[in-house]
Regions:
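Compositionally biased, intrinsically disordered low-complexity regions
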Residues: 7, 25-28, 66
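Intrinsic-disorder/low-complexity peptide segments enriched for small residues
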Residues: 2-3, 13, 140
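Bacterial extracytoplasmic/cell-wall-associated proteins, especially those involved in peptidoglycan
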Residues: 42-174
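Intrinsically disordered, low-complexity segments enriched in polar/charged small residues
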Residues: 7-8, 35, 84
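Gram-positive cell-envelope targeting signals
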Residues: 1-9, 39
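Long, intrinsically disordered low-complexity tracts enriched in Pro/Ser with mixed acidic/basic residues
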Residues: 13, 17-19
Length: 174
């Protein structure tokens, strides 16, 4: 029999395997790991809304009316829906000699981005079958040009057709 020194472990031999028996300190109680709540990632604006905001920057940033700015976006979306134009927002905006006020290098103004996203959401709701979504420009208006007085004139044909007279009710402040 061997005398043990303080802190030494006693061992019992059992079929050639060492088994610890006495003077063993139990392991510390483990606290379950706390998983931190994930920090919400800020929602990145979708690419189409960014393109539309850049178009608004170039085509309508000096226009005071939100309704008239929204009409620029509706004009783009009308073309997306029309068989005579590309079927994507970027395709419509980047088509040669069309939206000369669009550039992917233009800044993305937060207010213009919010307006672009709002119109895009309304258009998608309309495409999904919703009724009155707050459309400010009829579907057949595919063209616009500056009137020289800080406004755009929207038309159903490229040349010499009557300009839209703003008879639709607008969901935006004037």
């Amino acid at each position: 029999v061997r005398h043990m020194l303080p802190g030494e472990k006693a061992e019992t031999m059992y079929l050639g395997a060492a088994v610890s028996t006495v003077n063993e300190t139990p392991p510390p109680a483990q606290t379950p790991a706390v998983t931190p709540e994930p920090t919400p990632t800020p929602r990145q604006p979708e690419r189409d809304a960014v393109y539309l905001a850049q178009c608004l920057w170039g085509e309508a940033r000096g226009i005071p009316s939100q309704t008239e700015k929204a009409a620029v976006v509706w004009c783009v979306l009308n073309r997306v829906d029309h068989p005579g134009f590309p079927d994507t927002i970027h395709g419509v905006l980047s088509a040669p000699n069309q939206f000369l006020g669009f550039s992917e290098r233009f800044p993305v103004d937060p207010e213009l981005l919010a307006l672009a996203q709002d119109v895009l959401d309304r258009w998608r709701a309309e495409t999904a079958g919703a009724g009155d979504v707050g459309r400010v420009l009829p579907k057949d208006y595919l063209w616009f040009s500056a009137d020289g007085h800080g406004h755009n004139a929207f038309r159903a044909t490229f040349r010499q057709s009557a300009a839209w007279q703003w008879t639709a009710e607008s969901p935006y402040p004037t």
